[in-house]
A protein has these predicted regions:
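Structural preference for beta-rich elements and adjacent junctions enriched in aromatics
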Residues: 1-212
């Protein structure tokens, strides 16, 4: 799925462009696409991009709950222009969950924009705060025909090394102050039908885990 937006701004020099790590929030403008690919009006896959190229993804469930730990593999590119900023998004179908069918189907759809300096948020399909629900207020995307999905398999191997300096006797011919340690492992995801995904790690790299 390809998506894009041109977000006009009369003061492009004031666009908030804080550079953030993956899934960070911070002080930044944002554009997002929300896809209810089951069209159950309860589940949504959200993809956010900022003017600086920062990316966030999340899973909405039970209409109003959010899971920020959900991670997808997708791409985006953003550029600041003289009259605002623009962005393009590429979302592989393998990252979404949907019911394959040769017949035309409907998805829930919404677009979101955040202008940080005004604290302003806007939606293509209005989200009324006085109404209960979030995904259930999405608009409708029609005319989708999608074939059966291939088995979803994602493999992300890693290799890491560390150089540990250790004191010792410099006159010892076998002494080396460098103690190089290597490590390797792999993360994987295997799709089990359209509703389930098996996620696992072999020899996890705890050095890359953020401290809470």
């Amino acid at each position: 799925i390809y998506g894009g937006a041109y977000l006009f701004d009369k003061s492009p020099d004031s666009i908030a462009t804080q550079i953030l790590r993956k899934d960070g929030w911070g002080y930044s403008d944002w554009f997002a696409i929300g896809l209810d690919s089951y069209y159950d009006k309860r589940t949504c896959f959200g993809f956010h991009v900022s003017p600086s190229g920062s990316m966030r993804d999340m899973l909405h469930y039970n209409d109003t709950d959010t899971d920020d730990s959900w991670d997808a593999i997708w791409e985006s590119k953003s550029v600041i222009n003289n009259d605002g900023w623009s962005t393009e998004i590429k979302i592989p179908l393998s990252q979404l969950r949907y019911n394959p069918s040769e017949e035309e189907q409907r998805w829930g759809l919404n677009f979101y924009r955040r202008t940080a300096r005004y604290g302003e948020e806007s939606f293509w399909a209005p989200i009324f705060m006085e109404s209960k629900g979030f995904v259930s207020q999405f608009g409708i995307l029609k005319g989708i025909i999608l074939p059966k999905q291939n088995r979803r398999i994602e493999v992300l191997p890693y290799i890491s090394s560390a150089d540990k300096l250790e004191p010792g006797d410099s006159e010892d011919p076998y002494y080396s102050k460098h103690n190089i340690i290597g490590n390797m492992g792999v993360d994987f995801k295997i799709g089990l039908g359209s509703n389930f995904t098996l996620t696992g790690t072999i020899n996890p790299d705890f050095g890359q885990v953020e401290a809470e």
